[in-house]
From Swiss-Prot:
The lineage of its organism: Eukaryota, Fungi, Dikarya, Basidiomycota, Agaricomycotina. Residues 310-322, 372-384 have a biased composition (Basic and acidic residues). This is RNA exonuclease 4. GO terms for cellular component: nucleus. Residues 27-70, 310-408 are annotated as: Disordered. It comes from Cryptococcus neoformans var. neoformans serotype D (strain JEC21 / ATCC MYA-565) (Filobasidiella neoformans). It is an enzyme of class 3 (hydrolase). One of its GO terms (biological process) is RNA processing.
């Protein structure tokens, strides 16, 4: 006889009972796998556990990005680059960038990759400003919603990547957006930083008459409130061969660094030191062709600007960057050498009075009367002088001079 269910009692359906049994089986299997995993982790050696903890620490430190670098002593107006020996294999860098596989075994590429990381040894002479400087700035937001840019940090490196200037700048307006996630600048970094006018003057003095390299350099000059002569500016974003490689009319610095240097940058907050070094590295890779394409404009500008320079400044080209090591002699330098050789070895002998031997430096004045040439005595067309030279007539005939005669 069928059992009748009591009033108010609910009986589970067959489908629900089957689902419950399946769920209980899955739960038991998970418990068994979790217990096995726990036992395997507990059986690991202390050294492996230490390695895993160190990996976690490194990951957390790396995630802080440029903040680690920004808090160091090097970030100041008297900053010095960190130098170390070139190493093989994995490179440990204090900057937020990653060394990828090299595309070639070129010594120049090898040097430039380590220059970007600051992992290279420099001599004292290579730490001087020199004739080539690369610049990059970090900006924070001011105004409503932080939409306007203002200078917060400026970094300048030389031809070899040595830091010439790296300093925070105290904004002249209240900051409404520090953009720390991309600029790496925190509010505490700007406390006690140099005033804008002081940094502006310092940068202007450094950049005077230098070849200036940068990426989208107009943005940096704008926040610095400076200008730089076009013939002395090298913008890696506007250089056509780099645009063609990146297949973009406005290539990003990060993409160019990966394509040409094999260095991944801007993995977190940006570092203006790293970005300036990358711009310099890209310029040095193409320096020979780049300078050949603009040497006429550069030399024309220098020749014009040299007119207003004091005599003791003329011909001063700054510290030797040792471009010969890279085979980077420019077309302008080659032309100057050829002109110098032809000037010294052309067989022309110079004299104190100017001009060349056997050639008069004055002008002959020819006087004519009624369309006829007149000799030194004011007579005729000069035939009497020629005849006198042959002994045919006397050189002085006397009589009235032509200017004393009445007009016809």
């Amino acid at each position: 006889m069928d059992k009748k269910k009591a009033p108010g009692q609910t009986v589970a359906s067959s489908n629900w009972l089957q689902l419950q049994s399946t769920l209980s089986t899955i739960t038991k299997e998970k418990d068994v796998s979790n217990s096995k995993a726990h036992n395997s982790r507990s059986s690991q050696s202390p050294s492996s556990s230490l390695r895993s903890s160190s990996r976690i620490q490194r990951k957390s430190k790396h995630s802080q990005g440029v903040g680690q670098y920004m808090g160091r002593v090097e970030v100041a107006s008297t900053a010095k680059t960190t130098v170390s020996q070139l190493r093989k294999g994995k490179v440990i860098s204090n900057e937020p960038c990653i060394l990828l596989e090299a595309f070639s075994d070129s010594p120049l590429l090898h040097e430039l990759r380590h220059m970007v990381l600051g992992n290279h040894l420099l001599s004292e002479s290579q730490k001087e400003p020199g004739q080539y400087l690369a610049i990059d700035c970090e900006m924070v937001g001011v105004g409503p919603n932080g939409m306007e840019n203002t200078l917060a940090r400026v970094s300048i490196v030389n031809y070899h990547g040595a830091v010439i200037l790296d300093t925070f700048v105290q904004p002249r307006e209240p900051v409404t957006d520090y953009r720390t996630w991309i600029s790496g600048v925190k509010q505490s970094d700007l406390l006690g930083a140099p005033q804008f006018d002081e940094v502006n003057k310092q940068v202007a003095n450094l950049l005077h008459d230098k070849i200036l390299i940068g990426h989208a350099i107009d943005n940096d000059l704008k926040v610095l409130m400076l200008t730089h002569p076009g013939p002395l500016t090298r913008d890696t974003q506007k250089y056509k061969p780099l645009q063609e490689i990146a297949k973009n009319k406005r290539p990003g610095l990060k993409k160019l660094s990966e394509l040409l240097l094999g260095v991944q940058i801007q993995t977190g907050a940006h570092s203006s030191v790293v970005d300036a070094r990358v711009a310099m590295a890209l310029y040095r890779l193409h320096k020979k062709e780049w300078e050949r394409s603009v040497w006429r404009q550069t030399e024309a500008y220098r020749s014009i600007s040299s007119v207003n320079k004091p005599e003791h400044v003329l011909g001063k080209r700054g510290h030797d960057e040792k471009e010969a090591e890279d085979g980077e002699e420019t077309a302008g330098e080659s032309k100057r050498k050829n002109r110098k050789k032809s000037g010294n070895g052309g067989g022309r002998q110079q004299f104190p009075g100017g001009g060349r031997k056997g050639i008069s430096s004055g002008l002959d004045v020819i006087v004519r009367r009624n369309g006829q040439r007149v000799d030194e005595n004011g007579r005729g067309d000069g035939t009497s002088r020629r005849k006198a030279g042959r002994g045919e007539i006397s050189t002085f005939t006397g009589g009235e001079s032509w200017w004393e005669q009445p007009a016809a």
